[in-house]
Amino acid sequence: MRLMFLGTGAADWVEPQDGFFRANASLLIDGRVMIDGTAGVLARIGDPSAITDILYTHSHRDHYDPALLEAVAPVRVHAHRSWAGEIRVPGAEVVPFDVLSDFDVAGLRVTALPSNHSTERAYETTVHFVVRGGGRSFFYATDGAWLLNAEWHALLREELDAAVFDATVGEMYPADYRIFEHNTVGMVRLIVGVLRNPMNGPHPTHGGIRPVLKPGAKVYLTHLARTLHPAHEEIAKTCADGFVAARDGLEIEI
């Protein structure tokens, strides 16, 4: 699978600051499937007519933008059924999904997992995705703080080649209320440490838990807040021991 980070910023990136800018977090898979996205990422897509499907993690405006749907229509839109019925854009074919079940998207096999996030819609279920294709797989986990228990148990069935995590709050910034629905870089370090090595010594009833991340699997940070991170070069330097701090336009092969 070929991935491009169309956007890597949180909601507080509104306009370019000092020549550097992050569009709202969005990912392009094999040139045809998007995860989230606002109209601000259109310039990076190249050929909007090539987009066949969009997967939505949740309905926040920095992730779901009807203007983007209008620009790439006709398109299939995959959203959790708790809010999928509210998407009414001409040319958008809405395909609801449930959590903890697999579904096919343009030749990819996708599983939606419940995430620790919330929106103005109290009834909405927000999600992360496991995406599989060509014998490879990755985990896309933004927005959301930590991992819910159901999500963790679902991940135990996976052997992931890569992961992308919400890292809204920077390494050297004090935690605030956002840790209840977003990660700090330190939180991601703890999560990834367990995904790589689930067992810290023997346990009488939980033996045999294998790593979720394959050896050498790379971890990418996205959804970086403008007000809660230093310059990109500084982020890249402080995270180089375990992560890749993604920036808009980064392309990777999984």
Predicted regions and their residues:
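Conserved beta-strand hairpin/beta-sheet module of binuclear metal-dependent hydrolase folds
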Residues: 1-47, 123-142
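Metallo-beta-lactamase
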Residues: 79-135, 242-252
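Cap/insert and terminal regions of metallo-dependent hydrolase folds
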Residues: 147-250
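Divalent metal-coordination and catalytic microenvironments
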Residues: 3, 27, 58, 110, ...
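Active-site metal-binding motif and surrounding structural segment of the metallo-beta-lactamase
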Residues: 37-80, 159-163, 168
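Structural motif
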Residues: 32-33, 53, 108, 136-140, ...
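Short amphipathic alpha-helix with an adjacent loop that forms part of the alpha/beta core around
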Residues: 44-48, 69, 102-107, 151-156, ...
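Active-site metal-binding loops of divalent metal-dependent hydrolases
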Residues: 8-10, 32, 37-40, 58-59, ...
